[in-house]
Design a protein with these regions (language model features):
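Alpha-helical recognition/docking segments in bacterial nutrient-uptake
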Residues: 1-96, 100, 174-178, 188
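Short beta-strand elements in bilobed, periplasmic/extracellular small-molecule ligand-binding domains
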Residues: 11-21, 127-160
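Alpha-helix capping/helix-boundary segments
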Residues: 51, 114, 122, 188-190
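Hydrophobic alpha-helical segments within soluble ligand-binding/sensing domains
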Residues: 81-108, 124-128, 162-170, 190, ...
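Short acidic capping loops at alpha-helix termini that bridge into adjacent secondary structure
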Residues: 105, 137-140, 201-208
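Secondary-structure junction motif
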Residues: 108-128, 149-153
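Flexible loop/turn connectors
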Residues: 170-255
């Protein structure tokens, strides 16, 4: 939905669109940015790779005041416009959904990736909800090393990585029978966890919540989830980029 809205708004603004995929790799991201700039693009919308350090190419664009807008991941401390979701507030609300229903032993599930600003905000929101209930979020119940959903692993290891992760999750679930619910930071992780719960016959006992859901024509979803307005994020990012291309040098953050 986001990509489609970006393309449509580019048409509305009189722009053509080029797509470059980094597959979650920082070197590919750097190469892609360099290639686009060599081709003479007027501006770039980028969903940055998951890495604790920012790409030098992105920092270079900021220094040079090249028109660029980031989506999904905010680059804190870097003067680049961002369009996305208030991840901390959304995570807090989703965690409170479970807490309001009596679930106290929630397993927080995240990929094996550097804690980007978006991921940090989701962790902070989760912990804040627990603190508001006078509780402590037990990180020993967290699953933090899933690789199958990361583009680099998915591209090169595919089913083998997924099988390894499922085995790891099943073992973790069996080791921690006290866990009563699961909070996944993305939909694909929620699907993996649900598959493991189903194999153990626990899918009805332990609810799974997540960020985002699957796209389908009837708007059905397997899980209670935070739904980001991907269409608006996409179109707004193009409008802000268009303003920058036309000379507006104000750095904007839109949540």
């Amino acid at each position: 939905q986001m990509l489609g809205s970006i393309e449509m708004e580019c048409r509305n603004q009189g722009f053509g669109m080029m797509l470059v995929c980094s597959y979650g790799r920082k070197d590919e991201e750097t190469t892609g940015i360099k290639r686009l700039r060599e081709l003479g693009v007027s501006g770039i919308i980028i969903m940055c790779v998951h890495d604790e350090n920012y790409s030098e190419s992105i920092l270079e664009m900021a220094v040079q005041h090249f028109p660029v807008v980031t989506i999904d991941r905010r680059l804190k401390g870097v003067p680049i416009s961002f369009v996305g979701t208030d991840s901390e507030a959304a995570s807090r609300e989703l965690a409170r959904y479970l807490l309001d229903r009596g679930y106290r032993k929630t397993c927080f599930v995240k990929p094996h990736a550097a804690e980007t600003s978006t991921l940090q905000e989701r962790i902070q929101g989760f912990k804040k909800a627990y603190n508001e209930y006078g509780l402590f979020a037990d990180e020993s119940l967290w699953i933090t090393d899933i690789r199958a959903t990361l583009p680099a692993y998915h591209q090169y290891r595919g089913e083998q990585q997924l099988a390894e992760d499922e085995e790891k999750i099943i073992e973790f679930i069996q080791k921690h029978p006290e866990i009563d619910s699961y909070f996944a930071v993305e939909y694909s992780l929620a699907r993996i966890v649900y598959t493991c719960l189903r194999k153990l016959g626990l899918q009805e006992k332990c609810p799974v919540v997540c960020f985002d859901g699957s796209d389908n024509i009837v708007q059905e979803s397997m899980f209670t989830h935070v739904k980001q307005d991907e269409k608006e994020i996409g179109s707004l990012s193009v409008r802000i980029l268009a303003d920058e291309i036309r000379g507006d040098d104000e750095v904007k953050t839109v949540l």
